[in-house]
C-alpha cells in the first residue's frame, strides 16, 4: 500500500489543513516511509508466540472511589475575569 499526493490532499482537506506543494511532497514521502515500516512488521515470524494481553497478573488495580470536598460554583468563579451566570466566559476560539 502506498500513499499518493492525491491521498495527502484528501486527508489534508478532511483535517482542514493546507500544505504547500513542497509540504505535500514531504508528507507523502513520510507517510509512505511509515507504511513501509508497518509492512516490515508483517514479515516478522510470530508462529508459536502467545498473544500478550497484559504485562502483569493484576486485574482492575484501581483506587477506591470516594467523595472529597470540592469548590462550590461561587468559589470557583470568584476570580474569573469574565463570567455569565454560573459559567466562565471565554473568548471565542473557533471562527
UniProtKB/Swiss-Prot annotation:
Q: What role does this protein play?
A: Allows the formation of correctly charged Asn-tRNA(Asn) or Gln-tRNA(Gln) through the transamidation of misacylated Asp-tRNA(Asn) or Glu-tRNA(Gln) in organisms which lack either or both of asparaginyl-tRNA or glutaminyl-tRNA synthetases. The reaction takes place in the presence of glutamine and ATP through an activated phospho-Asp-tRNA(Asn) or phospho-Glu-tRNA(Gln).
First-tier enzyme category under EC: ligase
List the NCBIfam families hit by this protein, alphabetically.
Answer: gatC (TIGR00135)
Q: What is this protein called?
A: Aspartyl/glutamyl-tRNA(Asn/Gln) amidotransferase subunit C
Q: What is its EC number?
A: 6.3.5.-
Quote any Pfam family the record assigns: GatC
Subunit structure, interactors included = Heterotrimer of A, B and C subunits.
| Keywords linked to the UniProt accession | ATP-binding, Ligase, Nucleotide-binding, Protein biosynthesis
**What biological-process terms (Gene Ontology) are attached?**
glutaminyl-tRNAGln biosynthesis via transamidation; regulation of translational fidelity; translation
Member of which family?
Belongs to the GatC family.
Q: Respond yes or no to whether keyword Nucleotide-binding is given for this record.
A: yes
Q: What species is given as this protein's source?
A: Prosthecochloris aestuarii (strain DSM 271 / SK 413)
Q: What's one GO MF term for it?
A: ATP binding
Annotated S-S bridges:
none
Reactions that this protein is recorded to catalyse? L-glutamyl-tRNA(Gln) + L-glutamine + ATP + H2O = L-glutaminyl-tRNA(Gln) + L-glutamate + ADP + phosphate + H(+); L-aspartyl-tRNA(Asn) + L-glutamine + ATP + H2O = L-asparaginyl-tRNA(Asn) + L-glutamate + ADP + phosphate + 2 H(+)
